[in-house]
Structure formats: structure tokens, C-alpha cells
Amino acid sequence: MRSGRYIGVMSGTSLDGVDVVLAAIDEHTVAQQARYCHPIPQDIKMAILGMCQGQAVTLSALGQLDTRLGILFAEAVLTLLKETGLRAQGITAIGCHGQTVWHEPTGEAPCTLQIGDNNRVAALTGITTIGDFRRRDLAYGGQGAPLVPSFHHALLLHPVERRIVLNIGGIANLSLLVPGAPVRGYDTGPGNMLLDAWIWRHCAQPYDKDALWAINGQANPLLLRRMLTDPYFALRAPKSTGREYFNLGWLERMLAGLPPIAPQDVQATLVELTAISIADQVLLVGGCERLLVCGGGAHNPLIMARLSALLPGIEVSTTDECGVNGDDMEALAFAWLASRTLSGLPGNLPSVTGASQETVLGAIYPVNVD
């Protein structure tokens, strides 16, 4: 593997900021050295949300958003470099996931679209950039997601302990790590996405800090049962999903025809949906000795408490306790995937995505050579 300093850039489905990490990576280690979270302007956030929820968009608007996000990602990287005192010449490459605006891995013409012009990122930072990671897996018949389980396997596989790594971002996904067995992983369903969208609508807050709003509500059993009957939860892996499926429109359809439910009770019910849909899948894959949680949902005490209650006998903790910052897991993963791409090594796991073979992921955007 080509060792060096890499930067990972991740803007996830939760839209809570652009996460940027600096890591020293070689064949055996991934050592995080710095982190920075760059704010996403509200107008860009609203444009992304509109596209993800199927609103009509012109090619001009899509192209301009692609450009603006590329500039935003470059600004985030340059800020990290300024804060660390590093120069572009000291960085081997950037792994830039891009912003997913559509993910449709099934049907006649499976597709996934991440925007944020990597040409701009490379040009503005002066650093070789690797992006467009998902579509190569899709080309080999895979879901294109999740891709992070390969990184979980590299960092968190235990020689004897059966583990599940659970990322609760906008969407929740798990990685089953069993010594001596192929990695399994897939999206379980909503993570923070519906919770964040609902509290934004009713309280104009980006997220429910410490679950204080949900704690004051009471889960509604009728709504919960209706949500859990959604066909996605019964699909067999490999499977993946996103904001284009689980969004406020989906929630409104679930609420339609039910007696009025107080907004904070809906929030409490959404916590139950996230926790139960995750716990059901943990048990479906045979459980584990330790559930390692990362992502924004790891900071939600109500989700964590419900997972512990729903999974007796399983130790529920965070990846931080294993030395991996859970807030930066995905950005670190794409820095690591960039190192594999530059080294000509595969980054996907067919046992996770359903692809017909392992493959090198992504496209390389080199800087000019003097």
C-alpha cells in the first residue's frame, strides 16, 4: 500500500457538516492526526435536500451545485491545512466521497450520484484527489454501498470476539465482523435522518441534542407498527438505501389517516424506529458479543439506551473505546480507500455489496506536473 498522509472528506446524508480528517496511513495502521468540520451553507443544504427528495431540478442547477460543493470541499481541506500548518506538497492524496443526491441501486439501470466536482478540489488544493468511489462497485452488480465495512474490517476485527460495528448517520448501517468469516454489512434503515428532519420542521433545530425533545414524548404504537411494515426492513441483504427513500414525504405517508399525534411523540416514535430496526437486524445476523457504535447517533443517549435494552447480553459501546473516533469514521474510511485506489488495491467487499468481484474503486484526479 502506498503510505503517506491522506485527507478524507465526507459529507453524509445527515448534512451536519463536511468532515475532514488528516491521517497517516500505511499497510498496517491508520493514525488520525487532525480533524475539522466545515459548515454547509443553508442554501446549499436546502438544495441538496430538495434533490434527494425528488424535487424537479434543471441541469443548470445540478451543475452549479456540483461546482459549489467542489469549492466547499476544497475550502474545508484548505482550512484543515491552515490549522495544521501543513502544505499541499506534504499530502499524498485526498479521498473525497462527495455528496450523495440520489442512490437507486436496483431496477433496469441501477445508479448512484455523488456530486462535488473533484476537478475543483484538486485544482484549488493542489492535491491529487480520488472520488466517485461507488459507481465501480455498481458496475460489477453491487449496491455501491455500504463501502465502509472494508475499513471496519481492517481496523476493528478482533481475533476471537464477534463484533458488529454500527454506524448511525443519516442512514444506519452495520458491519458484522466474525473472525475467519467474510464480512457482512448493509443499511438497516433510518438513523438520524428522520429525527433531524422532524425537529428541524417543528423546532428549527438541526438535531435533537441529547434527545431532550424525544425524551419528553411518548412513542405511538400505531405509527411505529405502520413504519415497521415498510418493505425495506424485510428485504434480504445486500441492500442499501438513502434520503431519496426515507424522508419527510415517507413519514407523512405513514402519518396519513392516523389520529393526530403530538410532534414530540412522533420524535419519540422515530427513536424507536431507529433502535428497533437496528436491533432486529443485529439479532437476524446472529448477534454479537460487542456492538461498537459510531456516527452522530452514538451521541443520542436515548438511542443508545434503547439499543442496550433491546439487546440484552450484548455490550453496547462506541468505537472511541477501541481508539477510533466515531465522529470521523467515514471520513477516515475514504482517506483509507483513497490509499488503496492509489495502490491499485480493491476497496469493496462483494460479501457486503453483492458485487460479482472485488475491484479498485474511484477515479483519480491528479494535479498538474510542473
From Swiss-Prot:
Question: What this chain does, per the record?
Answer: Catalyzes the specific phosphorylation of 1,6-anhydro-N-acetylmuramic acid (anhMurNAc) with the simultaneous cleavage of the 1,6-anhydro ring, generating MurNAc-6-P. Is required for the utilization of anhMurNAc either imported from the medium or derived from its own cell wall murein, and thus plays a role in cell wall recycling.
Stored SUPFAM superfamilies: Actin-like ATPase domain
Q: Per the similarity annotation, which family is this?
A: Belongs to the anhydro-N-acetylmuramic acid kinase family.
Does the record's keyword annotation contain Transmembrane?
no
NCBIfam families attached here?
A: PRK09585.1-1, PRK09585.1-3
Entry EC number(s): 2.7.1.170
Gene3D superfamilies in the record: 3.30.420.40
Q: Which UniProt keywords apply?
A: ATP-binding, Carbohydrate metabolism, Kinase, Nucleotide-binding, Transferase
Report which reactions are catalysed by this protein: 1,6-anhydro-N-acetyl-beta-muramate + ATP + H2O = N-acetyl-D-muramate 6-phosphate + ADP + H(+)
* CDD domains in alphabetical order: ASKHA_NBD_ANMK (cd24050)
Which top-level group of life is the source organism from?
Answer: Bacteria
Q: What class of enzyme is it?
A: transferase
Biochemical pathway = Amino-sugar metabolism; 1,6-anhydro-N-acetylmuramate degradation; Cell wall biogenesis; peptidoglycan recycling
- This chain's source organism reads Pectobacterium atrosepticum (strain SCRI 1043 / ATCC BAA-672)
GO-annotated biological processes: 1,6-anhydro-N-acetyl-beta-muramic acid catabolic process; amino sugar metabolic process; peptidoglycan turnover
GO MF terms listed in the record are: ATP binding; kinase activity; phosphotransferase activity, alcohol group as acceptor
Q: What is this protein called?
A: Anhydro-N-acetylmuramic acid kinase
Which positions bind ATP? 12-19
